[in-house]
Amino acid sequence: CVVLVMCMVVIAPMAEGAISCGAVTSDLSPCLTYLTGGPGPSPQCCGGVKKLLAAANTTPDRQAACNCLKSAAGSITKLNTNNAAALPGKCGVNIPYKISTSTNCNTVKF
């Protein structure tokens, strides 16, 4: 019982600040057309990219966002990997990793 309480005390603060994959998916859903080979990203897409970058302001948040992006990239059937990698730059932001199914999110730092 004491161990369970200790785990809850240690894990709860970390979970509270973590970015959810639902939020990542929601923010980037306007990017789907571009990510599957469509023309440049829409203003709504870039707004979502910028919102996500602003929300990921700690190393754990950036790693969580990276893992969500990696998972989402793997679930997009016709993902254009070049467009995925170019997305941040097309939106005028810099993220410290490539949006890819092969990214090692454990190496992402703030």
Swiss-Prot record:
The keyword Aminoacyl-tRNA synthetase does not apply. PROSITE patterns: PLANT_LTP. The lineage of its organism: Eukaryota, Viridiplantae, Streptophyta, Embryophyta, Tracheophyta. InterPro entries: Bifun_inhib/LTP/seed_sf, Bifunc_inhib/LTP/seed_store, Plant_nsLTP. Disulfide bonds join 21-68, 31-45, 46-91, 66-105. It comes from the Eukaryota. Keywords: Disulfide bond, Lipid-binding, Signal, Transport. GO terms for biological process: lipid transport. Belongs to the plant LTP family. Plant non-specific lipid-transfer proteins transfer phospholipids as well as galactolipids across membranes. May play a role in wax or cutin deposition in the cell walls of expanding epidermal cells and certain secretory tissues. Pfam families: Tryp_alpha_amyl (PF00234). Residues 1-17 form the signal peptide. SUPFAM superfamilies: Bifunctional inhibitor/lipid-transfer protein/seed storage 2S albumin. CDD domains: nsLTP1 (cd01960). It comes from Lens culinaris (Lentil). This is Non-specific lipid-transfer protein 4. One of its GO terms (molecular function) is lipid binding.
